[in-house]
Curated annotation (Swiss-Prot):
First-tier enzyme category under EC: isomerase
Protein name: 2,3-bisphosphoglycerate-dependent phosphoglycerate mutase
Site label Transition state stabilizer, positions: 182
Pathway(s) per entry: Carbohydrate degradation; glycolysis; pyruvate from D-glyceraldehyde 3-phosphate: step 3/5
Subunit: Homodimer.
Binding sites annotated in the UniProt record for substrate: 8-15, 21-22, 60, 87-90, 98, 114-115, 183-184
Swiss-Prot/TrEMBL keywords: Gluconeogenesis, Glycolysis, Isomerase
InterPro entries linked: His_Pase_superF_clade-1 (IPR013078), His_PPase_superfam (IPR029033), PG/BPGM_mutase_AS (IPR001345), Phosphogly_mut1 (IPR005952)
Its job: Catalyzes the interconversion of 2-phosphoglycerate and 3-phosphoglycerate.
PANTHER family on file: PHOSPHOGLYCERATE MUTASE
Gene: gpmA
Listed GO biological process terms: gluconeogenesis; glycolytic process
């Protein structure tokens, strides 16, 4: 049996402000840093050790990983960073407040933009300074691979090559792997692992800073999965994620 641990980054500044973040490189809040520290302490207390860790190239995931590894006294763990683990790109929605956008366009439309499997928001213009082609961290990525917007289907197509070419081979080689990434890039991995339908994946809510353990068979199919930590706290965190895209009630 193999084990894989997935962890969404801790609360970011734009999580706190309820903004569409996507590929915008915002940092963790103090709460997010504490979530990462507690996650690392929990992993250490439960006896987890890792041979290899992966994160996206966005600082909220990288910092979450480093804080967690530091709390585990495991800063020596080899780390691989890859853009394919980035959050879903939200196009022109990036930077907008989710509740304000819901008040303007309706909860249903915002839910579609946030979660619909095959519907992407309006793309960034190719000359928009927010376009990833202007970011030096993506300089070696072919321009045609860099998104100006994504639906979840696009995110799955981006993430799965990294699973197939890097994460899965490492697990099959017996390496214990930790992945620190984002709500939608982790949703893409979970959809693949659990064979979740396009419709059902919309309902999956992943809380920040909570280690999610997958026990996998020899074919890397899930035997079971579970969050570490307090069940009530995790349920409350999931509910908070689900409520992010709703208009505020007077």
């Amino acid at each position: 049996m193999y084990k894989l641990v997935l962890m969404r980054h801790g609360e970011s500044q734009w999580n706190l402000e309820n903004r569409f973040t996507g590929w915008t490189d915002v940092d963790l809040t103090e709460v997010g840093r504490e979530q990462a520290r507690r996650a690392g302490e929990l992993l250490k207390r439960e006896g987890y050790t890792f041979d290899l860790a992966y994160a996206s190239v966005l600082k909220r995931a990288i910092r979450t990983l480093w804080i967690a590894l530091d709390a585990m006294d495991a800063m020596y763990t080899p780390v691989g960073l890859n853009w394919r683990l980035n959050e879903r790109h939200y196009g022109q929605l990036q930077g907008l407040n989710k509740a304000e956008t819901a008040a303007k366009y309706g909860d249903e439309q915002v839910l579609i933009w946030r979660r619909a499997y095959a519907i992407a928001p309006e793309p960034l213009d190719i000359d928009d300074p927010r376009h990833p082609r202007f970011d030096s961290r993506y300089a070696k990525i072919p321009a045609e691979q860099l998104p100006a917007t994504e639906c979840l289907r696009d995110t799955v197509a981006r993430v799965l090559p990294f699973w197939n070419e890097s994460i899965a081979p490492a697990i099959r080689a017996g390496r214990r792997v930790l992945v620190a990434a984002h709500g939608n890039s982790l949703r893409a991995l979970i959809k693949h692992l659990d064979n979740i339908s396009d419709d059902a994946i919309v309902e999956l809510n992943i809380p920040t800073g909570q280690p999610l353990v997958y026990e996998l068979d020899e074919n890397l199919r899930p035997i079971r999965h579970y969050y570490l930590g307090d069940a009530a706290e995790i349920e409350a965190a999931m509910a908070a994620v689900a409520a992010q895209g709703k208009a505020k009630k007077d």
